[in-house]
């Protein structure tokens, strides 16, 4: 169960190898919703999807700003962003 004060930016990898970035308070629940075709037109036709990255933020505003910034990136820059964060987590 998610805590009310947890805010996450997450990235899904879709079955067509595209990325989807979003905001949620519960990453596991939101992944299940995407895979069930609930509340997202983009991923509905690109299932199954898998969470490949998420970041926790103190506020909703910070998390949605991270989401917006990610969505503005080119595919090449999205790949770089995800690779850099993967290296940081090792």
Curated annotation (Swiss-Prot):
Show the SUPFAM superfamilies listed in the entry. Answer: GIY-YIG endonuclease
InterPro entries with a match to the protein in the record:
GIY-YIG_endonuc (IPR000305), GIY-YIG_endonuc_sf (IPR035901), UPF0213_domain (IPR050190)
Q: Which residues form the GIY-YIG domain?
A: 5-80
Pfam families noted in UniProt:
GIY-YIG
Similarity remark: Belongs to the UPF0213 family.
Tell me the protein's name. UPF0213 protein lin0209
